[in-house]
């Protein structure tokens, strides 16, 4: 008898992408499979059953796919956090460090109201830089992060520790060792 596939079984690993020595964890194979995608969304929702969540915030770009599906299931709004210059209207921005240099993400300044309970989602937690910047944006608007949810955690890169040091609750469906 075959065992039931786990979320991790649906994720493809691509060697040496985007650079030599990197094992790229490709969630597009998970998204493309209806059963795999359903399992992932259901498992991402499970820890928050009965908990108040007012909006889901998704980090660009795969966090939009997950965040939209999760917000739909929760019957709440979805808010994107995007790279600088991609949102129309008035925004606030937050810079964060990359391996080589810096980047900036933005959110509409009216997307979250003070006191709203927010679930932050993305596909992968690596160093935690993008998620930490997203958390800061939400908090600057007065939102309260209920939790941060990811499909994949790369524990060797320390992102979970970064977010937990900010007082965040962190959930990931699976973890992969290495880079």
From Swiss-Prot:
Protein name, UniProt field: Adenine phosphoribosyltransferase
Lineage start: Bacteria, Pseudomonadati, Pseudomonadota, Alphaproteobacteria, Rhodobacterales
Pfam families: Pribosyltran (PF00156)
GO BP annotation list: adenine salvage; AMP salvage; purine ribonucleoside salvage
InterPro entries per record: Ade_phspho_trans, PRibTrfase_dom, PRTase-like, UPRTase/APRTase
E.C. code: 2.4.2.7
Subunit structure: Homodimer.
Organism this protein belongs to: Ruegeria pomeroyi (strain ATCC 700808 / DSM 15171 / DSS-3)
Function: Catalyzes a salvage reaction resulting in the formation of AMP, that is energically less costly than de novo synthesis.
Biochemical pathway: Purine metabolism; AMP biosynthesis via salvage pathway; AMP from adenine: step 1/1
GO cellular component: cytoplasm
PANTHER family per UniProt: ADENINE PHOSPHORIBOSYLTRANSFERASE
Enzyme class: transferase
Family the UniProt entry places it in: Belongs to the purine/pyrimidine phosphoribosyltransferase family.
Swiss-Prot/TrEMBL catalytic activity: AMP + diphosphate = 5-phospho-alpha-D-ribose 1-diphosphate + adenine
Keyword tags: Cytoplasm, Glycosyltransferase, Purine salvage, Transferase
Subcellular location: Cytoplasm
GO MF terms held by the record: adenine binding; adenine phosphoribosyltransferase activity; AMP binding
